[in-house]
Amino acid sequence: MEMGKWIHLELRNRTPSDVKELFLDNSQSNEGKLEGLTDEFEELELLNTINIGLTSIANLPKLNKLKKLELSSNRASVGLEVLAEKCPNLIHLNLSGNKIKDLSTIEPLKKLENLESLDLFTCEVTNLNNY
């Protein structure tokens, strides 16, 4: 199902500002980007986007209260630099199973001051000698 429709179903007659957890697993992203997710989800603390075909998270909206972001089993390799600005309170980030090949891709994650957990399982970057 298309991501925008999936979000509409997940709202269940609530406003975006009422939602603290959003599960978009296995929905379909259009052109590898997030769609239908806006900064109106201002109370969102958990976002699951597992296996939705993402290639970039560059258009992620500002989600100040987001603490846990699940991006596993996608094809994302660009856009990680927006996380520190858009999700400054992120504690857990799961990027396992993405197309992350070099350290420069994850370098911007150093700016996430509250990050406690980073999962890069099966990402090619973990095979580098200086990882």
Curated annotation (Swiss-Prot):
* InterPro entries linked: AN32, Leu-rich_rpt, LRR_dom_sf
List the signal peptide residues: none
Domain of life (superkingdom): Eukaryota
Q: Does the keyword Repeat apply?
A: yes
Name the UniProt key words of this record, in alphabetical order.
Answer: Leucine-rich repeat, Repeat
Matching SUPFAM superfamilies, A to Z? L domain-like
User: Which is a Pfam family this sequence falls into?
Assistant: LRR_9
Q: Where are the LRR repeats?
A: 18-38, 43-64, 65-87, 89-110, 114-131
Q: Which cysteines are joined by disulfide bonds?
A: none
So what family is this one in? Belongs to the ANP32 family.
What's this protein's name? Acidic leucine-rich nuclear phosphoprotein 32 family member D
